[in-house]
């Protein structure tokens, strides 16, 4: 019975990761909060850190499937631009290589920030709560722009600004998808375009992160303490990420970002309250 309860915990963690990775409410913040509520307040140790990477891989696979056509076009046209002189002249190839470069520009800052400071960031309930409240305030500020016209395409300057803002997502509790929405919408870029750009950034970022996670698993096989549990979390993270991205693209608008703002505020206050008591 105890082991079944443990497996249920893994399933819940996978669902939390799948939903909160896509919605702008911070998956890292929710998973830290969950570990405190259901795992007896344990710190995020090597095993849990690896677990977070595995559930992230579930989200990665879901987004890769959802955006497979876009990813395929970007990869193929990038190779065509480099190796095929005739294809290089085609407008669509030039547009796709330009978009790929913008994605790279946008992920460089968070990559550097992650390497330099990620190991030194606090992951207690107080810091998580504060970060979630910051996420809430940023989403609310963008909500105030709901009556503005959003029509701009993403330029190299836009990508740079989004990248600099996205850098702050290394702080647990700051939603990466949320802060990229803020970065894009504040530059009057249409929300569907920002979402596509944001999640393609996530796919690029996840490749080295997942690679490091697999390396750590091979290097420290003891951290893979519960393969069935990890597998369940991966599966449920994948399923719920795929469901949530479909909901996100179909229903999320600038006007209803207020609900995510209120939700992040509520969870942030709960996190701070739990820290105090």
Swiss-Prot record:
GO terms for biological process: cell wall organization; peptidoglycan biosynthetic process; regulation of cell shape; response to antibiotic. It is found in: Cell membrane. It catalyses: di-trans,octa-cis-undecaprenyl diphosphate + H2O = di-trans,octa-cis-undecaprenyl phosphate + phosphate + H(+). The keyword Cell membrane applies. GO terms for cellular component: plasma membrane. Keywords: Antibiotic resistance, Cell membrane, Cell shape, Cell wall biogenesis/degradation, Hydrolase, Membrane, Peptidoglycan synthesis, Transmembrane, Transmembrane helix. It is an enzyme of class 3 (hydrolase). Its EC number is 3.6.1.27. GO terms for molecular function: undecaprenyl-diphosphatase activity. Belongs to the UppP family. Catalyzes the dephosphorylation of undecaprenyl diphosphate (UPP). Confers resistance to bacitracin. Bacitracin is thought to be involved in the inhibition of peptidoglycan synthesis by sequestering undecaprenyl diphosphate, thereby reducing the pool of lipid carrier available. This is Undecaprenyl-diphosphatase. It comes from Acholeplasma laidlawii (strain PG-8A). The gene is uppP.
């Amino acid at each position: 019975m105890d082991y079944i309860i443990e497996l249920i915990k893994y399933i819940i963690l996978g669902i939390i990761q799948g939903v909160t990775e896509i919605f702008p409410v911070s998956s890292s913040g929710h998973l830290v909060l969950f570990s405190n509520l259901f795992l007896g307040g344990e710190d995020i140790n090597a095993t849990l850190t690896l677990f977070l990477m595995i559930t992230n891989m579930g989200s990665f696979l879901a987004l890769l499937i959802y955006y497979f056509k876009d990813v395929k076009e970007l990869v193929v046209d990038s190779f065509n631009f480099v190796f095929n002189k005739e294809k290089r002249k085609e407008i669509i190839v030039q547009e796709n290589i330009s978009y790929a470069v913008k994605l790279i520009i946008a992920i460089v800052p968070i990559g550097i920030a992650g390497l330099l400071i990620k190991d030194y960031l606090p992951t207690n309930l107080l810091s998580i709560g504060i970060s979630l409240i910051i996420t809430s305030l940023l989403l609310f500020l963008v909500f105030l722009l709901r009556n503005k016209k959003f029509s701009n395409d993403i330029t190299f300057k836009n990508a740079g600004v989004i990248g600099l803002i996205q850098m702050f997502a290394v702080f647990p509790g700051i939603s990466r998808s949320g802060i990229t929405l803020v970065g894009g919408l504040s530059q009057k870029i249409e929300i569907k375009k920002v979402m596509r750009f944001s999640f393609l950034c996530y796919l690029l970022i996840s490749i080295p992160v997942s690679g490091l996670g697999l390396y750590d698993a091979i290097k420290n096989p003891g951290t893979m303490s519960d393969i069935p549990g990890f597998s369940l979390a991966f599966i449920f993270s994948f399923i719920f990420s795929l469901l949530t991205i479909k909901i996100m693209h179909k229903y999320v608008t600038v006007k209803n970002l207020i609900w995510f703002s209120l939700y992040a505020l509520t969870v942030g206050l709960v996190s701070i309250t739990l820290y105090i008591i």
